[in-house]
């Protein structure tokens, strides 16, 4: 005889939340799913370049390999852009 009630509760209208707002609904075993990145703000889908560093990994990599910080890389690009506009 199979065991009864061994499967988790299924929520057919689970809310996916990104940055405090509901971005979509889906089926899940959790009533709410909190995400940092989704297709609406991912650089691949939006066409923008943005460094998302929630745990300091990019800065740690830049320091380890002597490349400065992630912010200095973007500031160099902005400085070059200003110089080319003159």
Curated annotation (Swiss-Prot):
InterPro entries per the UniProt record, alphabetical: Ribosomal_bL28/bL31-like_sf, Ribosomal_bL31, Ribosomal_bL31_A, Ribosomal_bL31_sf
Record's keyword terms, sorted: Ribonucleoprotein, Ribosomal protein, RNA-binding, rRNA-binding
Comp. bias regions, Basic and acidic residues: 76-86
Highest taxon of the lineage: Bacteria
Entry GO terms, CC: ribonucleoprotein complex; ribosome
Region (Disordered): 65-86
The UniProt record lists the keyword Ribonucleoprotein: yes
GO biological process, one term: translation
Sample GO molecular function, one term: structural constituent of ribosome
Subunit field text: Part of the 50S ribosomal subunit.
Function: Binds the 23S rRNA.
Family classification: Belongs to the bacterial ribosomal protein bL31 family. Type A subfamily.
Name of this chain's protein: Large ribosomal subunit protein bL31
Species of provenance: Prochlorococcus marinus (strain MIT 9312)
Gene: rpmE
